[in-house]
């Protein structure tokens, strides 16, 4: 999938081309540096976080077969070596992955924060605990002003992470904080989310192409 394909299928996103390309470059730089993605959002955007992580952790548009080096390492590490009955399954079906963590999926930790400190800190606490300087926090908020997401962005910046925001078209607290903001051309929640989907599908495809061909 190319940027041209994205814009041909969704002409309204032409105005976002520069920011989408900057987002792509940011994600590629993150993975080149050995970093990971942390993703946060509420409601439908929380589901989008799970969706994005799913596209990155395994094959999306390509199969991402293991390298010969990885297959050899498997054979050498299994108890029965090449005779191990699980070698064929592991070497043949495991896929290359790109590390991404959906923070809304961390139910036990989120509810602990809600119960023990402040519900507004659910994503900030996990970002603080999991984030490293080479990582990027991806914030999805249709308004760009969701308090728990904004607090996570502030925590991320303090720890040296970069921040990518996907929002609606209006300037927002997230657009002030983020290194890159993709402001899709809509304000209604469902319309913003409908634009976010093709944007992040393109980003996942572009990152996959960069690292797995």
Give the ranges of each region predicted by the language model.
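Glycine-rich, small/polar surface segments that engage phosphate groups of diverse ligands
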Residues: 30-130
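Generic N-terminal amphipathic, Lys/Arg-enriched alpha-helix
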Residues: 1-15
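Glycine-centered short loops/turns at secondary-structure junctions
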Residues: 34-35, 134, 160
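Short beta->alpha connector loops at strand-helix junctions that form conserved
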Residues: 124, 141, 167, 182-190
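Short, glycine/polar-rich helix-capping loops at beta-to-alpha or helix-loop-helix junctions
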Residues: 165-178
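A short, well-structured juxtamembrane/interface segment
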Residues: 15-33
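A charged, well-structured terminal subsegment
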Residues: 129, 192-213
């Amino acid at each position: 999938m190319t940027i041209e394909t994205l814009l041909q299928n969704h002409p309204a996103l032409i105005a976002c081309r520069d920011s989408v390309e900057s987002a792509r470059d940011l994600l590629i730089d993150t993975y080149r540096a050995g970093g990971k993605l942390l993703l946060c959002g509420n409601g439908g955007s929380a589901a989008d976080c799970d969706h994005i992580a799913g596209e990155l952790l395994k094959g999306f548009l390509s199969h991402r077969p293991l390298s010969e080096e990885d297959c050899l390492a498997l054979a050498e590490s299994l108890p029965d070596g090449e005779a191990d009955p699980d070698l064929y399954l592991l070497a043949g079906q495991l896929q290359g992955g790109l590390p991404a963590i959906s923070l809304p999926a961390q139910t036990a930790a989120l509810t602990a924060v809600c119960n023990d400190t402040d519900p507004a800190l659910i994503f900030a606490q996990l970002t603080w605990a999991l984030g490293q300087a080479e990582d990027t926090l991806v914030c999805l908020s249709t308004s760009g002003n969701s308090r728990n997401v904004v607090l996570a962005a502030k925590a991320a910046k303090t720890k040296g992470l970069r921040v990518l925001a996907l929002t609606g078209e209006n300037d927002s607290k997230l657009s002030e904080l983020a290194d890159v903001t993709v402001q899709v051309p809509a304000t209604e929640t469902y319309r913003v989310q409908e634009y976010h989907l093709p944007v992040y599908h393109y980003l996942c495809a572009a990152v996959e192409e960069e690292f797995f061909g």
